[in-house]
A protein has these predicted regions:
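RNase H-like nuclease fold core
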Residues: 1-21, 26, 30-31, 35-38, ...
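Intrinsic disorder/low-complexity segments
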Residues: 3, 8-10, 40, 100, ...
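Intrinsic-disorder/low-complexity, polar/charged segments
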Residues: 3-5, 9, 44, 76, ...
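Short, surface-exposed helix-loop/turn micro-motifs enriched in polar/charged residues
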Residues: 17-20, 41-44, 60, 79, ...
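Mobile genetic element proteins and their domesticated derivatives, centered on retroelements
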Residues: 8, 20-23, 32, 47, ...
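Conserved beta-strand -> loop -> alpha-helix junction used to position metal-binding or nucleic-acid-contacting
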Residues: 20-26, 31-67
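Acidic/histidine-rich catalytic cores and adjacent linkers
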Residues: 73-177
Length: 177
C-alpha cells in the first residue's frame, strides 16, 4: 500500500492561488489565510447581492439589484468605486443596513479588478464551485450508510467527473500559469 503524502508537502509543489472567491463563511477565510497566505479575498457577488437585497422591501429589490449589477459590471475599478458611491448615496439614508452590508466588504468585493479582465466573470462568484459540491452532497446523503469508504470515494469521483462535462470553459485560460 502506498504511503499517503501529507497535504503540506503537496502544497509546496502546487502553484499558489492569487485569489479565491467565497461567501461570508469566516472559517473559509481563516483557512485561506493559513494555507495560502497572501492570497486576495474575493467576496462572491451572488451571495453579497442576496444579503443586501434581504435587507430591503421586495418592492425596492429590482431597482437595487440593477444598481448592484452596475457596480460589479463596471469596466474598471474606478467606475465600480463611483457606482458604489452612487449606490450608497441613493440608498444609504433610507436603507442603511443594506448600504452597510455592501460597504463593509468593499475591498473584497472589488478584488477581482486586480486581475486580467478575462478572469472577472469567474472570480466574481463562487457558485460554480458550490454547485459541484451540492451535486455530490445531494447524492451522498441519499445513499447514507449504503456505501463503504472506497465506494463512496468512487461515487464522489464519478459525480465530479460527470459534473465537469457541463462546466463552462475558462475565459483567458491561456493566461493561467
Amino acid at each position: 500500500m502506498a504511503t499517503p503524502i501529507p497535504a503540506k508537502a503537496v502544497l509546496e509543489f502546487t502553484p499558489r492561488p492569487r485569489t479565491l472567491p467565497g461567501d461570508g463563511a469566516l472559517g473559509f477565510w481563516r483557512a485561506l489565510d493559513e494555507v495560502f497566505p497572501g492570497a486576495a479575498h474575493q467576496r462572491c457577488w451572488v451571495h453579497k447581492t442576496a444579503n443586501v437585497l434581504d435587507k430591503v422591501p421586495k418592492s425596492v429589490q429590482p431597482a437595487m439589484k440593477a444598481d448592484l449589477r452596475e457596480i460589479h459590471g463596471a469596466p474598471t475599478r474606478a467606475a465600480a468605486e463611483v457606482a458604489l458611491a452612487v449606490f450608497v448615496e441613493k440608498y444609504g439614508a433610507k436603507y442603511a443596513r443594506a448600504a452597510d452590508c455592501l460597504t463593509k466588504d468593499r475591498e473584497a468585493l472589488l478584488a477581482f479588478y486586480d486581475f486580467p479582465a478575462e478572469h472577472w466573470d469567474h472570480l466574481r462568484s463562487s457558485n460554480p464551485i458550490e454547485s459541484v459540491f451540492a451535486t455530490v452532497r445531494h447524492r451522498t446523503v441519499r445513499t447514507k450508510g449504503a456505501l463503504s469508504a472506497t465506494t463512496a470515494k468512487l461515487m464522489v469521483f464519478k459525480l465530479v467527473m460527470a459534473a465537469s462535462k457541463t462546466w463552462r470553459r475558462l475565459k483567458g485560460e491561456n493566461q493561467l500559469p
